[in-house]
């Protein structure tokens, strides 16, 4: 299991070294995300497992889903939901024809299993989904989305 934890830590090391703190965790169904958002979340979601592995679950978790400060902390006690989401993202990427490194996925999966005692039964509320969709729309470049949608027809 140490091997899996080391791989999980190395997945985020590059971002930690650069001081990047943005971690995208979306609530909408992975099939509704653009390729860019889907791949970004696939890369960034494991950071929360890494954070909990290194620091434990923080005491000051926001009560409600939030964007910006507190976004990562909100998910630290929802590892079961995150793991399920990660599996869904992985499957959606495969369905779209992406070549995904299955070893990296397995490493995250194995590390997540160690921490799955945090069972939250989290289900996003309609308001949380709306907030997430509004953020996605704000960040999307409409022309790029149109091009991606037309290429999938």
What are these regions (language model features)?
Residues 15, 20-153:
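Extended, charge-rich alpha-helical interface modules
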Residues 4-6:
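Short hydrophobic alpha-helical segments enriched in small aliphatic residues
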């Amino acid at each position: 299991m140490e091997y899996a934890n080391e791989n999980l830590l190395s997945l985020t090391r590059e971002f930690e070294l650069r001081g990047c703190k943005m971690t995208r965790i979306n609530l909408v169904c992975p099939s509704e995300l653009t390729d860019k958002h889907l791949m970004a979340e696939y890369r960034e979601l494991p950071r929360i497992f890494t954070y909990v592995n290194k620091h434990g679950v923080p005491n000051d978790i926001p009560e409600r889903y939030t964007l910006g400060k507190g976004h990562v902390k909100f998910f630290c006690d929802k590892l079961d939901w995150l793991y399920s989401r990660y599996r869904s993202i992985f499957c959606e990427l495969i369905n779209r024809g992406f070549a995904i490194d299955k070893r990296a996925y397995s490493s995250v999966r194995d590390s997540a299993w160690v921490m799955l005692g945090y069972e939250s039964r989290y289900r996003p509320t309609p308001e949380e989904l709306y907030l997430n969709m509004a953020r996605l729309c704000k960040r999307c470049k409409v022309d790029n989305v149109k091009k991606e949608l037309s290429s999938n027809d």
